[in-house]
């Protein structure tokens, strides 16, 4: 009986007929989340949060634990897939004006910040060379905060340098934060269904809706199956495509890698950080690169919701996507010309999108009135 009620609930859930494939990434994110929690749980059974044993425990999982190589690779590749889906999900929200559902957008941005924190803590856990140095560089940014910076850094490290207490608390945080993500995801979905999802036209779709099941459930299942297939193919043939070669060596505090860089999904924020020569300025720009998303619902001035009918904003949006990719690329390069200049120009363009959003909206309204 409860099973029938759940099916009936999905069957009665009205959804716009014209929502495209870009709306499937929410369910894909939910799948990624479930997969990460399951693989993470099994990996935590074999992991040892100790600076002398952490690296060896990962090697033990991959070599000795039955199907451990699959769990470890699923967890690592799953994180990359998670962020690919997240960035597409955010881009869809920006393009189609989903941010006008303010509560859903603000909870989603908070989710993104929590996800990035969780991924950062997880990257430190293998205690490889790049894990150690990336953690040192990023956590050291806290010292840029006036008055409180040094105290906060010492508190986070659990001492005067990154050591055993740091790894222990990072493991604890990496384990507990996903449960916070699940809770906030539930709130995110509830807030979304209070108003209902938007559609590519940005219009009210009350007059033309279909049941969620079977139409959108099968569509979701197809996209989820495709995503899992891509992940399994990656794990089978190119499992180390996203790994840094430096991270296959155990952490050595006495040897600094030639280029310190985090995982690829943080490179755009890291590129913005590096483009500013001042430490405090760089730390603020790093924080702003994500938190600026919180301003979008409050700077929308256009009469139309979606960018489907807004050619100027379409140009701005695709410029944003291009700058995102260029910043990611420059962050992998050494801090020298021409990369520093490219990084500074693209970082300026990145923030320009959010600052010019209200002006472009106002201009479009003026043009529309003139045409009428």
Curated annotation (Swiss-Prot):
<keyword id="KW-0496">Mitochondrion</keyword>
<dbReference type="GO" id="GO:0006122">
    <property type="term" value="P:mitochondrial electron transport, ubiquinol to cytochrome c"/>
</dbReference>
<feature type="binding site" description="axial binding residue">
    <location>
        <position position="174"/>
    </location>
    <ligand>
        <name>heme b b562</name>
    </ligand>
</feature>
<dbReference type="InterPro" id="IPR005798">
    <property type="entry name" value="Cyt_b/b6_C"/>
</dbReference>
<keyword id="KW-0812">Transmembrane</keyword>
<feature type="transmembrane region" description="Helical">
    <location>
        <begin position="280"/>
        <end position="300"/>
    </location>
</feature>
<dbReference type="InterPro" id="IPR048259">
    <property type="entry name" value="Cytochrome_b_N_euk/bac"/>
</dbReference>
<dbReference type="GO" id="GO:0045275">
    <property type="term" value="C:respiratory chain complex III"/>
</dbReference>
<dbReference type="InterPro" id="IPR005797">
    <property type="entry name" value="Cyt_b/b6_N"/>
</dbReference>
<dbReference type="Pfam" id="PF00033">
    <property type="entry name" value="Cytochrome_B"/>
</dbReference>
<feature type="transmembrane region" description="Helical">
    <location>
        <begin position="218"/>
        <end position="238"/>
    </location>
</feature>
<keyword id="KW-0999">Mitochondrion inner membrane</keyword>
<feature type="transmembrane region" description="Helical">
    <location>
        <begin position="170"/>
        <end position="190"/>
    </location>
</feature>
<dbReference type="Pfam" id="PF00032">
    <property type="entry name" value="Cytochrom_B_C"/>
</dbReference>
<feature type="transmembrane region" description="Helical">
    <location>
        <begin position="25"/>
        <end position="45"/>
    </location>
</feature>
<feature type="binding site" description="axial binding residue">
    <location>
        <position position="188"/>
    </location>
    <ligand>
        <name>heme b b566</name>
    </ligand>
</feature>
<keyword id="KW-0830">Ubiquinone</keyword>
<dbReference type="GO" id="GO:0005743">
    <property type="term" value="C:mitochondrial inner membrane"/>
</dbReference>
<keyword id="KW-0349">Heme</keyword>
<keyword id="KW-0249">Electron transport</keyword>
<dbReference type="InterPro" id="IPR030689">
    <property type="entry name" value="Cytochrome_b"/>
</dbReference>
<keyword id="KW-1133">Transmembrane helix</keyword>
<feature type="transmembrane region" description="Helical">
    <location>
        <begin position="105"/>
        <end position="125"/>
    </location>
</feature>
<protein>
    <recommendedName>
        <fullName>Cytochrome b</fullName>
    </recommendedName>
</protein>
<comment type="similarity">
    <text>Belongs to the cytochrome b family.</text>
</comment>
<keyword id="KW-0472">Membrane</keyword>
<dbReference type="InterPro" id="IPR036150">
    <property type="entry name" value="Cyt_b/b6_C_sf"/>
</dbReference>
<keyword id="KW-0813">Transport</keyword>
<dbReference type="InterPro" id="IPR016174">
    <property type="entry name" value="Di-haem_cyt_TM"/>
</dbReference>
<feature type="binding site" description="axial binding residue">
    <location>
        <position position="75"/>
    </location>
    <ligand>
        <name>heme b b562</name>
    </ligand>
</feature>
<dbReference type="InterPro" id="IPR027387">
    <property type="entry name" value="Cytb/b6-like_sf"/>
</dbReference>
<dbReference type="InterPro" id="IPR048260">
    <property type="entry name" value="Cytochrome_b_C_euk/bac"/>
</dbReference>
<feature type="binding site">
    <location>
        <position position="193"/>
    </location>
    <ligand>
        <name>a ubiquinone</name>
    </ligand>
</feature>
<feature type="transmembrane region" description="Helical">
    <location>
        <begin position="312"/>
        <end position="332"/>
    </location>
</feature>
<feature type="transmembrane region" description="Helical">
    <location>
        <begin position="69"/>
        <end position="90"/>
    </location>
</feature>
<feature type="binding site" description="axial binding residue">
    <location>
        <position position="89"/>
    </location>
    <ligand>
        <name>heme b b566</name>
    </ligand>
</feature>
<keyword id="KW-0479">Metal-binding</keyword>
<dbReference type="GO" id="GO:0008121">
    <property type="term" value="F:ubiquinol-cytochrome-c reductase activity"/>
</dbReference>
<feature type="transmembrane region" description="Helical">
    <location>
        <begin position="339"/>
        <end position="358"/>
    </location>
</feature>
<dbReference type="GO" id="GO:0046872">
    <property type="term" value="F:metal ion binding"/>
</dbReference>
<comment type="function">
    <text>Component of the ubiquinol-cytochrome c reductase complex (complex III or cytochrome b-c1 complex) that is part of the mitochondrial respiratory chain. The b-c1 complex mediates electron transfer from ubiquinol to cytochrome c. Contributes to the generation of a proton gradient across the mitochondrial membrane that is then used for ATP synthesis.</text>
</comment>
<keyword id="KW-0408">Iron</keyword>
């Amino acid at each position: 009986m409860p099973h029938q009620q759940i099916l009936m609930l999905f069957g009665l859930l009205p959804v716009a007929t014209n929502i495209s494939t870009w709306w499937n990434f929410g369910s894909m994110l939910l799948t990624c989340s479930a997969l990460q929690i399951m693989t993470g749980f099994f990996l935590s059974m074999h992991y040892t949060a100790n600076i002398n044993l952490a690296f060896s425990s990962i090697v033990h999982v991959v070599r000795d634990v039955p199907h451990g190589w699959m769990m470890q690779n699923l967890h690592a590749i799953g994180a990359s897939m998670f962020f690919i889906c997240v960035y597409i999900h955010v881009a869809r929200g920006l393009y189609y004006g989903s941010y006008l559902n303010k509560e859903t957008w603000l909870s989603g941005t908070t989710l993104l910040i929590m996800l990035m924190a969780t991924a950062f803590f997880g990257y430190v856990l293998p205690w490889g060379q790049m894990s150690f140095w990336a953690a040192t560089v990023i956590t050291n940014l806290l010292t840029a905060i006036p008055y409180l910076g040094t105290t906060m850094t010492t508190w986070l490290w659990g001492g005067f340098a990154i050591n055993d207490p740091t790894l222990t608390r990072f493991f604890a945080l990496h384990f507990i934060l996903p449960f916070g993500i699940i809770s906030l995801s539930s709130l995110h979905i509830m807030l979304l269904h209070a108003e209902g999802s938007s559609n590519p036209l940005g219009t009210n779709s009350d007059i033309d809706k279909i049941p969620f099941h079977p139409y959108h459930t099968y569509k979701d299942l197809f996209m989820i199956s495709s995503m899992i297939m891509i992940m399994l193919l990656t794990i089978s043939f190119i499992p180390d495509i996203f790994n840094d070669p430096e991270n296959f060596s155990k952490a050595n505090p006495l040897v600094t890698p030639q280029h310190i860089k985090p995982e690829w999904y943080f490179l755009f924020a890291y590129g913005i950080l590096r483009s500013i020569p001042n430490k405090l300025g760089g730390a603020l720009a790093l924080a702003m690169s994500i938190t600026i998303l919180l301003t979008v619902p409050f700077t929308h001035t256009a009469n139309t919701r979606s960018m489907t009918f807004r050619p100027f904003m379409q140009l701005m949006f695709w410029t944003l996507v291009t700058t995102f990719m260029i910043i990611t690329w420059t962050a992998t390069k050494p801090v020298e010309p021409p990369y520093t200049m490219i990084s500074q120009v693209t970082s300026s363009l990145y923030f320009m999108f959010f600052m010019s959003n209200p002006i472009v909206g106002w201009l479009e309204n003026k043009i529309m009135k003139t045409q009428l």
